[in-house]
Amino acid sequence: MKDLAKNKKALHDFSILETFEAGVVLKGSEVKALRAGRANLKDSFVRIIKGEIFLLNAHISHLDTTNSHFRPDERAPRKLLMHRKQIDKLFGSVTKDGLTMVALALYLNDKNIIKARVALAKGKNLHDKRETLKKREADMEARAAMKKFI
């Protein structure tokens, strides 16, 4: 699996509870742009609208080498493909538990098909973010000490 775009900010702002794989409906020029690494998921999020799941606010830049007559919107909502039971489960978690859905990555699977890694997440507050940073620093110091010792 080759990651084409990652949402590193989501890992910082949310605690991930469960991840799902979803197909993405794209135009041909968007696929070429994704393979060229011209995507950004920084402020993107996932919503369920009328029983369908959409990736919103994901930025896929236009590639200059593709057809110039048709230029898709760079921040257009992109439909995600999931099984009905998965969508219903996500909808229940979002409405009852107050969780959010976030796009973590766009990647190529083993069959060279572009997929989205969608996560069910809970927002972190400032205290949680600081705690995560402290744990990360402590782990780095422990690794450095182990390296010196060995």
From Swiss-Prot:
GO terms for molecular function: RNA binding. Keywords: Cytoplasm, RNA-binding. Coiled coil: none annotated. PROSITE patterns: SSRP. SUPFAM superfamilies: Small protein B (SmpB). It comes from the Bacteria. Gene3D superfamilies: 2.40.280.10. It is found in: Cytoplasm. One of its GO terms (cellular component) is cytosol. GO terms for biological process: trans-translation. InterPro entries: SmpB, SsrA-bd_prot, SsrA-bd_prot_CS. Required for rescue of stalled ribosomes mediated by trans-translation. Binds to transfer-messenger RNA (tmRNA), required for stable association of tmRNA with ribosomes. tmRNA and SmpB together mimic tRNA shape, replacing the anticodon stem-loop with SmpB. tmRNA is encoded by the ssrA gene; the 2 termini fold to resemble tRNA(Ala) and it encodes a 'tag peptide', a short internal open reading frame. During trans-translation Ala-aminoacylated tmRNA acts like a tRNA, entering the A-site of stalled ribosomes, displacing the stalled mRNA. Belongs to the SmpB family. This is SsrA-binding protein. It comes from Campylobacter curvus (strain 525.92). The gene is smpB.
